[in-house]
Structure formats: structure tokens, C-alpha cells
Amino acid sequence: MSPTPIKHYLQFSDLSADEYEYLLDRARILKAKFKNYETWHPLHDRTLAMIFEKNSTRTRLSFEAGIHQLGGHAVFLNTRDSQLGRGEPIEDAAQVISRMVDIIMIRTFGQEIIDRFAKHSRVPVINGLTNEYHPCQVLADVFTYIEQRGTIAGKTVAWIGDANNMAYTWIQAAERLDFTFHFSAPPGYQLDPAMVPDWAASRVKVFDNPLDACQGAHLVTTDVWTSMGFEAENDARKRAFKDWMVTTAMMDRAADDALFMHCLPAHRGEEVEAAVIDGPRSVVWEEAENRLHVQKALMEYLLCGRY
């Protein structure tokens, strides 16, 4: 085991390709231990603080179960029930909370909130989701693809839907892990140029037609049309995205061995056909489970370094 200095995981680009190679292999090992009921407690007596401003099922369950399986325990903090929800400065909260726990996961709205928190934290901070990025989910998706098909390097990932936190995280992953990213969304929901790095021109291709975006893709993925915090736009988004539902016809344009993923929860008949998400090319349940294993690998790495 080689200890590391304090390192945060706030967006996908925070780790190098070499670190991802280690993490993904470590996730494979930890998943095997889990399946074999093998006890592994490198985080014995360590405490994870989980701070939620946005509610979640999968994020809370995967982090809470994950730290427990590694020998530690979790403390759940909802901002509505803490001083953070009563106007305590983020910087002050970071100083206090990070003196009482060993690692912190935050699921919130603006990326600047978690960036400010991490700047004043004495322990590692993990982005459980922000409006801008969702690195833990893309890490799980990448692991799922590798588990099913081998390396993701040189492959094509097609994103059909909103320019949201998942799309921007996939762009960062394309650079780190050497694959191509296809993006398609209706007018008015395109990528924000300020969120797309200069190097992206060599990795990212934007398509007006979602069928064209799926052509030859090895992975087709999507998300809900209306993310949390945008509920007032729901009706307008349903109208705008009606031709961006992932269909069997789109999957038929993809590579013969293409997979379908969705970070869930899904709305069948909106962003994806039931025949696709419930069909043989879908790996959404493996994808959901793998949040648990990649996050265990991540917490182990941030606290213990490499084994």
C-alpha cells in the first residue's frame, strides 16, 4: 500500500489515465471479493460524511453500502436539516465537517459549491453529482463497458439527449481514456461552448440527427430529458426531445455488439423505448450495481493509495 496526499474527485479530469487503469482494475477485484463474500476492511473505523442537497436512491445506497463493505460507516447529512441549509458559509462547514470524518461525498447543484468546499476541506471530497458533472456515474459506465466488452479505448460512445452533467463528464472521459464521443440533441439543448475544452474537436462529434450519431457506436447512452432542478421545463422538453428517444432503429445503426446504458431512473416511452432498455443489448442493471464497486475502489484509493 502506498499512501497518497489529499486528493479530491470533483470531475473526471481530476485523475490521470494511469490512475483510471488502476481504479478500474481495483473495482474488478473488489467486485470479485463482494461476489465471493470475502471480507475486506481497509477502511476499518473510517467515517464517510454524505451531504445531500439533491435527493438520490442510487448515490446514497451505493456510497453507504460501499463504505460499510470496506469496514467503515457513513453519516447522512441533508442540507435542509443542517446548518448548511440555514446559511452557514460553505467554507466554515468544510472546516468543521472535515475535522470529524475521513472522507466526504457531496451531491449538490452548482459545481462551484463543491469546489469551494473541497478547497477548505482537510479530507478527500467526492462529487456525488452536480449540475455540471457526474464523474462517479461515468466511472461506473466505463467499468461496465470494459467488463462486458474489453477496453473502451478506440471505441465510440453515442450520447442521445440533453447536454447535461453526464454529457460533459463523458467528454472529459473521452480525452482521458482515448475514445470518440458522439453527441446529439435538439436545437436549444446543445453543448455549451464554455463547457467544452479546446481539445474536444478531436474527440467530440456533434450530430443533428440522432440516428447518425448512433452509426457504428459501440455504446449508446442517454438520461432523463428533465434533470432535477429543471422541472418547470418538463413539458417544453418533452416536445423538444420527442425525436431523441433511443429506439430499436437507433440501436440497429450502432455496432453489432453495441451496448445500451442509462444512469437511471428511466422513463420508458420518453428518452428510451421499453424494447431497448429491457432488451438484450441493455446492461443498465449491471451499470447500476457497478456504482457500488467503482466507488469502493475510489474511496479506498483516496484514503489508502494503491495496494
Curated annotation (Swiss-Prot):
GO aspect biological process, one term: citrulline biosynthetic process
Top-level division of the source organism's lineage: Bacteria
Keywords: Amino-acid biosynthesis, Arginine biosynthesis, Cytoplasm, Transferase
GO MF, one annotated term: ornithine carbamoyltransferase activity
Biochemical pathway: Amino-acid biosynthesis; L-arginine biosynthesis; L-arginine from L-ornithine and carbamoyl phosphate: step 1/3
Record: residues binding L-ornithine: N165, D223, S227, M228
Entry EC number(s): 2.1.3.3
Alphabetized InterPro entries for the sequence: Asp/Orn_carbamoyltranf_P-bd, Asp/Orn_carbamoylTrfase, Asp/Orn_carbamoylTrfase_sf, Asp_carbamoyltransf_Asp/Orn-bd, Orn/put_carbamltrans, OTCase_ArgI
Predominant location: cytoplasm
Cysteine disulfide partners in this protein: none
UniProt KW Amino-acid biosynthesis keyword: yes
Signal sequence, renumbered to the chain: none
Functional note: Reversibly catalyzes the transfer of the carbamoyl group from carbamoyl phosphate (CP) to the N(epsilon) atom of ornithine (ORN) to produce L-citrulline.
Database matches in NCBIfam families: orni_carb_tr (TIGR00658), PRK00779.1 (NF001986)
Protein name: Ornithine carbamoyltransferase
